[in-house]
């Protein structure tokens, strides 16, 4: 009987005997309830809307960040929940000048944060040392010499709107990265800013101005002569007034 059947009929007969229920068909309702994604995308999607920052403020830039807590800006809508413990945070926001004595504490806080973790350098003093980078021997010339920085936010100080823009850009970075690539890009060496290129500036006060006749120190004898001349002029003025 099989010899008289066509190949198509034989395949259909084989499917009926092997699978009597038939091939399952994916309905429209079932397709709307299935999400196809990768582990990296699912992991990044869960993290980008729940960044928990650790606020490390040492100077005036942190005052601008404190304005975000109020109802006018309301940074809670971005899922930012400030934490007081580095073990519960995944975002470190450094705002203000970092000194040599505070550098070990900052590095310790960063190392206590669990992976994956991110850093935002906020303000000119945090990024380059700011106005203290010219002649200060205690200011760190850039926090990226201590810990790896993911996003730089320049300004003195940055506006709250700029902080929001930095958070949005960081969320885009979080949503496009891979876990394995993130581990490969971790910093393995750290170089502290202990040597500064300082230059000697000579004093402009050389004392040459004292040699000028117009700026010489007045002697006591000269003061007596000036007082006598003033008295004489006063007496002459009094005599002129009496004669009038």
From Swiss-Prot:
Molecular-function annotations in GO: 4 iron, 4 sulfur cluster binding; iron ion binding; NADH dehydrogenase (ubiquinone) activity; quinone binding
One Gene Ontology cellular component annotation held by this UniProt entry: plasma membrane-derived thylakoid membrane
Enzyme class: translocase
Record carries keyword 4Fe-4S: yes
Residues annotated as binding [4Fe-4S] cluster: 60-61, 125, 156
Pfam families cross-referenced by the UniProt entry: Oxidored_q6
Catalytic function, reaction form: a plastoquinone + NADH + (n+1) H(+)(in) = a plastoquinol + NAD(+) + n H(+)(out); a plastoquinone + NADPH + (n+1) H(+)(in) = a plastoquinol + NADP(+) + n H(+)(out)
Cofactor(s) the protein requires to work: [4Fe-4S] cluster
Cofactor note: Binds 1 [4Fe-4S] cluster.
InterPro entries hit by this protein: NADH_UbQ_OxRdtase-like_20kDa, NADH_UQ_OxRdtase_20Kd_su
Subcellular location: Cellular thylakoid membrane
Catalytic activity, EC: 7.1.1.-
Membrane topology: Peripheral membrane protein
BP term (GO), one: photosynthesis, light reaction
Keywords, alphabetical: 4Fe-4S, Iron, Iron-sulfur, Membrane, Metal-binding, NAD, NADP, Plastoquinone, Quinone, Thylakoid, Translocase, Transport
Protein family (similarity comment): Belongs to the complex I 20 kDa subunit family.
Function: NDH-1 shuttles electrons from an unknown electron donor, via FMN and iron-sulfur (Fe-S) centers, to quinones in the respiratory and/or the photosynthetic chain. The immediate electron acceptor for the enzyme in this species is believed to be plastoquinone. Couples the redox reaction to proton translocation, and thus conserves the redox energy in a proton gradient. Cyanobacterial NDH-1 also plays a role in inorganic carbon-concentration.
NCBIfam families: nuoB_fam, PRK06411.1
Subunit structure: NDH-1 can be composed of about 15 different subunits; different subcomplexes with different compositions have been identified which probably have different functions.
Protein name (database record): NAD(P)H-quinone oxidoreductase subunit K
